[in-house]
């Protein structure tokens, strides 16, 4: 059980690291070029999906830090209610990060390819550093989402090991 707890702590630390690194890459990235004697600046604020992804990453990183803090102070969960809550929040966080990353990737693909119908130019020909940093941020976010899926499975194991395998939704101690 101790190894499982250590694994959960390491996973949460890695998730926080990847999410904060992604937030820094997205939030601090901007590039200015002179195009036809006009200074053009591009940043994450021009892409709504990247802005939403930044906020999602910060909130989920804060949630994982709170979970680490609860584990640090040995807040032992004797009943199943806090474990259910933790399990559902871990699941929700994993799904939200994956969905936000997928939306940001789709929006970024529009920036890479352009769209004649929407009069979007291909930004990556002009703003290459911006595009490479956004691409690396999206890859790091997918890694964080995969780690969160693994963390959710550990959370599910911690929850369902309390229940009896013979009686439906009965604690092992009461059967």
Swiss-Prot record:
One CC-aspect GO term: plasma membrane
Side of membrane Extracellular, spans: 29-45, 113-136
Keyword Glycoprotein: yes
Membrane topology recorded in Swiss-Prot or TrEMBL: Multi-pass membrane protein
Major location category of this protein: membrane
Compartments where found: Cell membrane
Keywords: Cell membrane, Glycoprotein, Membrane, Transmembrane, Transmembrane helix
Residue stretches spanning the membrane: 8-28, 46-66, 92-112, 137-157
Parts of the chain on the Cytoplasmic side: 1-7, 67-91, 158-175
Glycosylated sites: 41
InterPro entries tied to this protein: CASP/CASPL, CASP_dom
PANTHER family xrefs: CASP-LIKE PROTEIN 2C1-RELATED, CASP-LIKE PROTEIN 4A4
Subunit structure, as described in the record: Homodimer and heterodimers.
Family designation: Belongs to the Casparian strip membrane proteins (CASP) family.
Protein name, entry field: CASP-like protein 2C1
Source organism of the structure: Arabidopsis thaliana (Mouse-ear cress)
Biological classification of the source: Eukaryota, Viridiplantae, Streptophyta, Embryophyta, Tracheophyta
């Amino acid at each position: 059980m101790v190894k499982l707890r250590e694994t959960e702590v390491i996973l949460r630390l890695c998730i926080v690291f990847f999410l904060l690194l992604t937030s820094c890459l997205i939030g601090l990235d901007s590039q200015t070029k002179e195009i036809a004697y006009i200074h053009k600046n591009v940043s994450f604020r021009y892409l709504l999906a990247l802005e939403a992804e930044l906020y999602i990453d910060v909130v989920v990183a804060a949630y994982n830090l709170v979970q680490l803090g609860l584990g640090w102070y040995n807040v032992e969960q004797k009943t199943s209610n806090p474990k259910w809550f933790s399990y559902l929040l871990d699941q929700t966080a994993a799904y939200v990060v994956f969905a936000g990353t997928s939306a940001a990737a789709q929006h970024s693909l529009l920036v890479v390819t352009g769209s004649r119908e929407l009069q979007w130019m291909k930004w990556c020909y002009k703003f290459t550093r911006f595009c490479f940093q956004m691409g690396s941020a999206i890859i790091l976010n997918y890694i964080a989402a995969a780690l969160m899926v693994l963390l959710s499975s550990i959370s599910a194991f911690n929850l369902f090991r309390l229940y009896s395998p013979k009686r439906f939704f009965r604690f092992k101690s009461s059967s």
